Amino acid sequence: MKQAAIIVVLDNDKRDPEVFRQELENVAKETVKLTDCVFCVAVKEMEAWLLGDENAIWEAYPSAKKKFLRDYEQDGICDTWQILANTVYAGGLSELQKKSQNRYSEIGKAKCEWADKIGVNLVLEENISPSFRFFINELEMRIASE
């Protein structure tokens, strides 16, 4: 029988990522005895993983506004999805909020579109998001051991 692994990927908006990961690992040690378990925490939001590859953004959105990325700190605790909205959405965050009337379902649709368009252009080795790198490294280690 092949070795099983559980890989959990989740957003982390407010917690210290290392403390949060350790809390999750402690719970896993107590409850999941025989399975390899990895927690990959997207620091702040999953959009941080998209912002980790600027070339993928430019390929998906050639008219993206680079000025919004100048001061972005990768995996920093900041308004990540809002920065992405200002970068790629026509009219930026304010236009998206106005058009969606701040309804999460409409904002969620925009986020899904960004993930689809940018995601297909991501180059795994070039993504500079530390939390994304951790995720990829964990996957690669498990694939290599097969």
Where are these regions (language model features)?
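C-terminal accessory helical subdomains adjacent to catalytic cores in phosphodiester-
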Residues: 1-7, 12-146
